[in-house]
C-alpha cells in the first residue's frame, strides 16, 4: 500500500519537469526515444548506443537543472559537447592505432550530428555571420580605442540576443572568442 501511494508522486514530478520544457525540446526527446525503439527492433547496435548516450546526457542535464526549464538551446550545447568528446576520443584512438574504435566513434558522431541538425537552432555559419556583424558594429563604435573581449561581452544583451538569433549563449560566446582575434587585430 505504501508503494502505491509513493508511485504517483514520483511520476507527476517527472512530467512536470518535461511540461516545463520548450515544445522543441520535448519533441526532440520523444524523437530520440522513438528512434531508440526502432534501432532496438532493427538491432542496430551503433545507433542504439549513440541514442542511449544522448538520452543519458539529457537525463543527467535534467537532474542538474532541478526543475528549471530546458530548451532546444541546451540540447544543442549538449550535442556539441558529445561531438567534441567523440572528436577527442577519435584523436586518442588514432594515436594508439585503434582503427576499429575510430570507426565506432565516427559512426556515433555522425548520428549525433544528424540529430543536432534537426534542432530548430541556427547553424554555426549563421552564428558566425551574426557575430561578425556585431563585432564590426562594435569596432566602428569604439573607433581607434583598444577593445577587450570582456567589454564586448558586457555590451551584449544576453537575455534577448540568444532568442533573436535562435541559438544558445554558449555558441555565441564561442563564436565571439573565435572571431575576436580576426576583427580586433
Curated annotation (Swiss-Prot):
Quote the cellular component terms of the Gene Ontology held in the record: mitochondrion
Q: Tell me, what's a Pfam family for it?
A: YqeY
Task: Indicate the residues annotated as transit peptide.
Answer: 1-20
Q: Which residues form a coiled coil?
A: none
Q: Where in the cell is it found?
A: Mitochondrion
Indicate yes or no for the key word Mitochondrion: yes
Keyword Protein biosynthesis on entry: no
Gene Ontology MF: a single term: carbon-nitrogen ligase activity, with glutamine as amido-N-donor
- Its principal location? mitochondrion
Instruction: Give the UniProt keywords, A-Z.
Output: Mitochondrion, Transit peptide
What the record says about family reads:
Belongs to the AIM41 family.
Its recorded name reads Altered inheritance of mitochondria protein 41, mitochondrial
Name its species. Saccharomyces cerevisiae (strain YJM789)
The lineage, from the top, is: Eukaryota, Fungi, Dikarya, Ascomycota, Saccharomycotina
Which gene underlies this protein? Answer: AIM41
Amino acid at each position: 500500500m505504501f508503494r502505491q501511494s509513493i508511485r504517483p508522486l514520483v511520476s507527476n514530478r517527472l512530467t512536470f519537469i518535461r511540461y516545463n520544457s520548450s515544445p522543441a525540446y520535448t519533441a526532440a526527446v520523444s524523437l530520440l526515444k522513438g528512434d531508440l525503439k526502432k534501432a532496438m527492433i532493427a538491432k542496430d547496435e551503433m545507433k542504439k548506443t549513440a541514442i542511449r548516450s544522448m538520452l543519458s546526457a539529457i537525463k543527467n542535464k535534467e537532474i542538474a537543472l532541478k526543475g528549471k526549464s530546458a530548451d532546444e538551446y541546451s540540447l544543442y550545447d549538449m550535442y556539441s559537447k558529445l561531438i567534441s568528446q567523440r572528436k577527442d576520443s577519435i584523436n586518442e584512438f588514432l594515436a594508439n592505432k585503434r582503427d576499429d574504435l575510430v570507426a565506432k566513434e565516427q559512426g556515433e558522431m555522425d548520428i549525433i550530428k544528424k540529430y543536432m541538425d534537426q534542432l530548430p537552432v541556427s547553424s554555426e555559419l549563421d552564428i558566425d555571420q551574426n557575430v561578425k556583424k556585431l563585432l564590426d558594429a562594435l569596432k566602428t563604435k569604439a573607433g581607434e580605442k583598444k577593445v577587450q573581449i570582456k567589454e564586448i561581452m558586457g555590451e551584449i544583451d544576453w537575455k534577448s540576443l540568444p532568442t533573436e538569433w535562435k541559438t544558445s549563449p554558449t555558441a555565441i560566446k564561442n563564436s565571439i572568442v573565435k572571431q575576436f582575434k580576426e576583427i580586433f587585430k
